[in-house]
Amino acid sequence: MSFDIAKYPTLALVDSTQELRLLPKESLPKLCDELRRYLLDSVSRSSGHFASGLGTVELTVALHYVYNTPFDQLIWDVGHQAYPHKILTGRRDKIGTIRQKGGLHPFPWRGESEYDVLSVGHSSTSISAGIGIAVAAEKEGKDRRTVCVIGDGAITAGMAFEAMNHAGDIRPDMLVILNDNEMSISENVGALNNHLAQLLSGKLYSSLREGGKKVFSGVPPIKELLKRTEEHIKGMVVPGTLFEELGFNYIGPVDGHDVMGLISTLKNMRDLKGPQFLHIMTKKGRGYEPAEKDPITFHAVPKFDPSSGCLPKSSGGLPGYSKIFGDWLCETAAKDSKLMAITPAMREGSGMVEFSRKFPDRYFDVAIAEQHAVTFAAGLAIGGYKPVVAIYSTFLQRAYDQVIHDVAIQKLPVMFAIDRAGIVGADGQTHQGAFDLSYLRCIPDMVIMTPSDENECRQMLFTGYHYNDGPTAVRYPRGNAQGVALTPLEKLPIGKGLVKRHGEKLAILNFGTLMPEAAKVAEALNATLVDMRFVKPLDDTLILEMAAQHDALVTLEENAIMGGAGSGVNEVLMAHRKPVPVLNIGLPDFFIPQGTQEEARAELGLDAAGIEAKIKAWQA
């Protein structure tokens, strides 16, 4: 997409933040309007995260106008809201390539721009990193400002509060901005509150506040009186007691869509010492009515026609694996009142919308709190219930100690429904589900299942749910199922694989939903094909049979080769002194960048042609 200078005359003047800071302040509202329209035009053509960026246009302009970026360091949490930031920092003409193979990264990425201070993708990391960056700048004697922008969802995570608690203790010079888009701007976020924010962030108030603390620090009754008086004055309009108690100077809430007001407040706060906290209120989807009305649907969008205000409907094809899981969940809950479902803020993505409506008293969205989600599930299991934790592979990493310490060691019957396992696609390195088999396989008493299709997925969910001797995990990919017939639910024998095709000389041991590709290769090479089903416990007997009956084995999985299912097969063969050649095929030892799932699999040699080529090259 070429940039239309006539359509965006003010934005055309801004190819860097240095150029932005040369603009007269009175032109900034027009810049914000053009930036918002350009974002709509670009994302509707290319797909991507959408509603969050619409809500941070004024904040982004104000931050880069007031702070000397990239010398001053600006950190975005998660990064969904950072598209305007990318546009203003030299990547305007490439924004249409975002999330595409070889294009702009979907999130702030250190290797892409000096303006991207922290590579992100997972939530709630910004304040911790910001403290470290601020401390480093202070120790180096650099007069560098540090600003972290975090959303109202991300700030609920324990890591964010751990960081704020630490900041209150060591008191680095830094600013945390809470982008609160949970509700539309209410009346109290108006002229009075904006005036108060500028007053409280001004040098006079700050000097009086800090000077008063020094003068009266040794006089406890007066110190306490001053503190209570200050809290009383601010408490009339400022809901910031929690952040003040953590050691921050709280300012807000202020209108996050008033670019002139934001600039005034940020200029006042820029030179304040110690940890500062600015609370701004924004509207997700701001400026595009369909996104304002339905910010969840418009959070991340495919290509669409902005004039219609409608996203393209599903073609009505095969259901996704998340839908398969959600249907199984509802079906099981209707029969068993002990089922409890838990998600860390991924209701829509995990296919749990219908369940949350039908069984609200058994649905628990714990917010962005993966560690809590797992230990909460452990508590439910101790209480005699049957918890199912629906979680993305990449996010389960954040609760690894809880899986071991709070679930596995106690052999609690918690089932993990691991969505987005394997290659995820457009969200890139931070979201690929590349490691779950490796990091779960080494945990004692964990049962791990890898379905090859949607029917097997249902059977494994059923099997895991009724397994009472410890935790279980069923991992399934992002994307549509294969269209196989669904059969009545029944328990699978634990740790047993299934031979799908008998061949000669070569046996392919497949783990998971690469089965259709494996079947094509097995047919082409006249190889035996095995659906291994279980990564733990492995079917040792079947593995040894395949080794005895074939000249060579190939393992296939959409997980890191290192420590994955194939490594488990190698261990079985070595333990039994079977010197059969084995080729492990899976995800390589590097972080897989963005692109479609099909592009990634083709590039990594995980489509049928690539798998066959790998095997032939190995046999040559």
Curated annotation (Swiss-Prot):
UniProt cross-references to SUPFAM superfamilies, sorted A to Z: Thiamin diphosphate-binding fold (THDP-binding), TK C-terminal domain-like
Claim: Methyltransferase is one of the keywords in the record: no
Record note on cofactor: Binds 1 Mg(2+) ion per subunit. Binds 1 thiamine pyrophosphate per subunit.
UniProt EC number: 2.2.1.7
Positions annotated to bind Mg(2+): 152, 181
GO molecular function terms listed in the Swiss-Prot or TrEMBL record: 1-deoxy-D-xylulose-5-phosphate synthase activity; magnesium ion binding; thiamine pyrophosphate binding
Reaction(s) this enzyme catalyzes, per UniProt: D-glyceraldehyde 3-phosphate + pyruvate + H(+) = 1-deoxy-D-xylulose 5-phosphate + CO2
Assigned protein family: Belongs to the transketolase family. DXPS subfamily.
Complex and partners: Homodimer.
Species this protein is from: Salmonella agona (strain SL483)
Cofactor: Mg(2+); thiamine diphosphate
InterPro entries from the UniProt entry: Dxylulose-5-P_synthase, THDP-binding, Transketo_C/PFOR_II, Transketolase-like_Pyr-bd, Transketolase_BS, Transketolase_C, Transketolase_CS
Name this protein carries in UniProt: 1-deoxy-D-xylulose-5-phosphate synthase
A Pfam family: DXP_synthase_N
GO CC aspect terms: cytosol
Keywords: Isoprene biosynthesis, Magnesium, Metal-binding, Thiamine biosynthesis, Thiamine pyrophosphate, Transferase
Amino-acid positions noted as binding thiamine diphosphate in the UniProt annotation, renumbered to this chain: 80, 121-123, 153-154, 181, 288, 370
UniProt-listed Gene3D superfamilies: 3.40.50.920, 3.40.50.970
Function: Catalyzes the acyloin condensation reaction between C atoms 2 and 3 of pyruvate and glyceraldehyde 3-phosphate to yield 1-deoxy-D-xylulose-5-phosphate (DXP).
SMART domains, sorted: Transket_pyr
Gene Ontology BP term (one): isopentenyl diphosphate biosynthetic process, methylerythritol 4-phosphate pathway
Pathway involvement of the protein, from the record: Metabolic intermediate biosynthesis; 1-deoxy-D-xylulose 5-phosphate biosynthesis; 1-deoxy-D-xylulose 5-phosphate from D-glyceraldehyde 3-phosphate and pyruvate: step 1/1
